[in-house]
Regions:
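An accessory alpha-helical subdomain
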Residues: 31-89, 208-257
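N-terminal low-complexity, Ser/Thr/acidic repeat segments characteristic of secreted
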Residues: 90, 121, 255, 259-265
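N-terminal pre-Walker A segment at the start of P-loop NTPase domains
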Residues: 79-114
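Conserved nucleotide-sensing/catalytic segment adjacent to the nucleotide-binding pocket
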Residues: 1-43, 142-221
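A broad, low-specificity signal for short, low-complexity segments enriched in glycine/proline
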Residues: 84-87, 132-138, 155
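Glycine-rich phosphate-binding P-loop
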Residues: 109-110, 119-143
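Accessory recognition modules or surfaces
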Residues: 106-113, 119, 167-172
Length: 265
């Protein structure tokens, strides 16, 4: 549940609890309470694992993302902007944030199909160490300043960091490719972000980086397993709840909300 910041002014509460058959639910009380407790515990374990994996990634990034690397990224971004991003006629572009990927019960996923549907030209930023954010931020800022709308796609593990950038008006995208989730097609251009790192530092840190990668992958796998368990328990919850929900009333409420939103567009 998301609490509205300005109830009645910008947002409003939607009470779907009125759609329950409360008397009928009493007959499955014990089963509901058991499933509810179990699946919440699985989610908590998954979140702890993902938090730990993110902290390991932060440690790797702090090691490799030196000022010299950021300078190389900035120079490369300036070259791309001068070549690909032409100044528009109007005001600054509009930015929206959308997650393109997630860690789910099926594993780590990314909807690259969305990129293909919106953009013909795709730059793949090959980035096994999670360093591409400064470059993507500079590209996004340049595109917006030139008057182009942008879709900023944050990382699921690091929501304050960009992982992908889509510029549909230019049919141009910049996607981060990793060993776990590489861009599945032949890219328009490929940029090896890892090649910008200090070679001597990479060599000295090889064992540390290998260990970090192994532990991080294990933590994500454990999180995925916990999410799969949570989904199984949630599916059982739905089996218990569904016979006691007035779905006609649910759909009627949904249509009312859709009509209200459509009228405001």
């Amino acid at each position: 549940m998301v609490e509205p910041k300005y109830p009645g002014l910008v947002e409003e509460y939607v009470n779907l609890g009125a759609c329950y058959d409360r008397e009928g639910l009493q007959g499955v009380r014990d089963g509901l309470m058991g499933c509810m407790k179990g699946y919440k515990g699985c989610y908590q374990r998954a979140y702890r694992c993902l938090t730990a994996a993110a902290q390991i990634g932060e440690d790797v990034r702090a090691l490799l993302l030196t000022p010299a690397v950021e300078a190389k990224m900035s120079k490369r971004a300036r070259g791309i902007l001068s070549r690909e991003i032409k100044k528009g006629d109007g005001d600054a572009g509009r930015a929206v944030r959308r997650f393109l990927g997630a860690v789910t019960w099926k594993g780590a996923l990314c909807n690259f199909e969305t990129v293909e549907a919106l953009c013909r030209r795709v730059y793949e930023l090959s980035d096994p160490y999670g360093m591409a954010h400064p470059m993507l931020s500079q590209l996004a800022a340049g595109a917006l300043a030139a008057g182009h709308d942008a879709i900023l796609c944050p990382s699921p593990l690091y929501p304050d960091r960009l992982e992908h950038l889509l510029l549909p008006g230019l049919s141009l995208a910049f996607v981060t490719g990793t060993p776990a989730l590489p861009w599945p097609k032949r890219p328009y251009r490929r940029i090896r972000v890892d090649a910008m790192a200090d070679a001597e530092l990479l060599h000295r840190s090889r064992a540390r980086l290998k260990f970090s990668r192994k532990v991080s992958a294990a933590l994500v796998d454990e999180a995925v397993d916990s999410l799969a368990q949570a989904k199984a328990m949630h599916d059982e919850l739905e089996k218990l709840y569904n016979p006691h929900v007035d779905f006609g009333r649910v759909y009627e409420t949904a249509e009312e909300i859709i009509s209200s939103l459509t009228a405001q567009m």
